[in-house]
Amino acid sequence: MKLDLKILDARMRDYLPAYATAGSAGLDLRACLDAPLTLKPGDTALVPTGLAIHLADPNYAALILPRSGLGHKHGIVLGNLVGLIDSDYQGQLMVSTWNRGQTEFVLNPFERLAQLVIVPVVQAQFNIVDDFAQSERGAGGFGSTGRH
């Protein structure tokens, strides 16, 4: 898949999104910062990437996801948990960054912060019904199928 990428900050030419390995699903996104950003516990910040994408094809969307190491080791996750980039969006990719940890975290310029995953999209059409066909689960949820 070819994807249109617009470089909004010339410094990002040296830090284009890339797959870390041949088997990686996510492209690493970096913080396009002029100086280190300190996030105290509980702080949030909207961090620019210096990049914009245009998927153009309504059969695709992009997800911005946290990097597992930052979340597990430092408590750095996405403030919105998952960022959804629609196919017609053309603005800068921003990363809502939240320090849910117990200590300050310093995010350095051009540090890998999140990952971008391209996913297929199915746009549903609703069929209005009065009742559903019976299923084994029915309306059971929130642990109704058991714990183990």
From Swiss-Prot:
Gene Ontology terms describing biological process: dUMP biosynthetic process; dUTP catabolic process
Q: Which transformation does this protein catalyse, written as a reaction? A: dUTP + H2O = dUMP + diphosphate + H(+)
One Gene Ontology molecular-function label: magnesium ion binding
The Swiss-Prot or TrEMBL record lists the needed cofactor(s) as: Mg(2+)
Name the InterPro entries on file: dUTPase (IPR008181), dUTPase-like (IPR029054), dUTPase-like_sf (IPR036157), dUTPase_trimeric (IPR033704)
Q: Which family does it belong to?
A: Belongs to the dUTPase family.
Its protein name is Deoxyuridine 5'-triphosphate nucleotidohydrolase
Natural source organism: Burkholderia multivorans (strain ATCC 17616 / 249)
